[in-house]
Amino acid sequence: KLKRFIFYRNYGKDKVLEWGSGLSTPQIAERVAFLVSIEHNAEWYEKIKKNMAVSKKSYDNCKLLLRPPTRGGKGESVNTYWGEGPFKGQLKTMAGQNHYEDFKEYVDAPLNEGPFDIILIDGRARVACASKCHLLGHKDTLVFFHDFGVFGIPYYSECFEYLEPYGSVKSMARFKI
């Protein structure tokens, strides 16, 4: 149901932003007018870029951007961990507005690329990304937040300051700006 909802619809006229490039990036690019996909990990970025280059399909409508973290070297995760609470010991890099400084270039990369009709949040510094959506969209922009329910609402609760809930399918939450 989730794949059908996101990947198998044709959003041919839409301009889409994806924070967190992945194996679905080519599938999305095939179904939209234009895709901006931002990745923080250099090795993963090269893999996605190579996979798209060797494909027989044209991805001229896709702009892949590499934006490594400010701290953490060559695009690997900045290893900060939750110190207490239900997520004690788990990596903290995917959440939290406080990670904006670690991923500033990644979060801010699309600011001159919008407006976008659809925004997909599936990478690092997710709350920081959510906080920028109002600058990147319009009144009808839909925001899809992958794995929103996996860690529990408290993990990403700051997102409700920036986005209005609009439904969900499994672990994919849908919001409006």
Residue ranges and their predicted role:
Residues 106-177:
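C-terminal substrate-binding/active-site "lid" region of AdoMet-derived donor-dependent transferases
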Residues 3-7, 86-90, 112-113, 141-145:
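A generic short-segment signal for beta-strand/edge and adjacent turn/coil regions
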Residues 64-132:
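Internal catalytic-core helix/loop-beta-alpha segment
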Residues 38-41, 58-60, 87, 140-145, ...:
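Short, surface-exposed linear patches
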Residues 2-80:
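SAM cofactor-binding core of SAM-dependent methyltransferases
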Residues 6-11, 36, 91-93, 116-117, ...:
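N-terminal start-of-chain detector that recognizes signal peptides
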Residues 4, 47, 102, 155-158:
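Exposed alpha-helical structural elements
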